[in-house]
């Protein structure tokens, strides 16, 4: 067992990996476990994890790597995949794939996944070594485009840059994949590759003025500011933090600093990764203003612009916060990538606050949106989840579908162990999500046994590896859906007084081998209106959004082909 605490939050475990980092950083209120210390046990989440392994292994890595080999002037071993992988966004799934393999290997120890990870990383290294200057990217004819950028020729649009399809967004996936291979899967060579690629970007943009940089950032660019901040934390070099600032989009940041909602009409998932970067930079610099800006964005999106499943946006854009009519009627409802990124932002915010309200949102979005975006039979992923009553979703297929939400989907179901538990030092353990799982924590093992949400509660069993007692406080999250005074607690079958503080049931004692705590959390039926108060209600039981069984007629294209718009439900709008 290796316990790697996370001083910085998010996906990362940077403080434990870099205890001598030169950068001052915000002290977290809670710390996260290495995902390899957590194992899922039998549940819908474990099934989703298993299905994701099958999907990952069904993909041909040489086809995903083909754009990278072409970019390095090497002969590909196979043709590109179709769909978005050969129509301009070539290589974006390769970066997601590297991240997903890293998380899945850490989460399961699956040896075939580990071998696949090492192969993909070695081929990417071959491409980077051949390039000779740190470059690693699958953007078609990318060298020509990047040379134009280096020379100050910037032609930016929302979904394009110098006649390419969002190349900054594309290369961000490679940065994130290398970061995750290093920090999550502990592949040391990925660190060197990540730094070389960052140095290349620094040189490429060195001569651009601040005005040119901000103009370029009009083009969707993922979370490049976050990844450059990560490199700063990994290396302790403030030079990379300056680069992170250069890649921070001021037209989004400035209204947030003023606590202003200027989101209506803009592409939703373009903005969320930027805000993750603002928060990441804030934590490294102890910048309270940027942290408040990120929290304001979260509050605005969650409270004013999201529906009960935790998703947001219609046709990929933020609609007016006072009019959810398009949400109710469109076949292009909340996008999976948006919620994927909102959960990543939530993780950062929770770590520096330990405020359970963040976990209430996390639970709702994870159970109702993310888990449901995987076909439980064939493992395909969903792009849009329509809120139109009686409509349907479209599922990806491994050999035909390579949208952005396939990339985030590959990652989603490998990451369920991230937020189940947290700790503060060696004497505070937090149980945040009620998902059957085990945790290795120093000299003790924790088992969480539950069939939640079919069961209105959860049990925690403590096992001592050395047979010795351990004194610590066990903190069980009190969900917002539990009525005041209804939660009850037993230890080894004996009813105990419930002590609630800061959103948690707190049980401080010397725990011995075999101790079993059970928390009962009664659930109730309730109705929640849309944020525009239009009297369009969802019914929930506890945190679970309910749905009625309806007809299955005319669900055209439920399993996507390789067409450019194959992710959109093409059938008639029913009813």
Positions of the model-derived regions?
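Bacterial Sec-dependent N-terminal signal peptides
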Residues: 1-26
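Glycan-recognition and catalytic cores of secretory/periplasmic carbohydrate-active enzymes
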Residues: 24-575
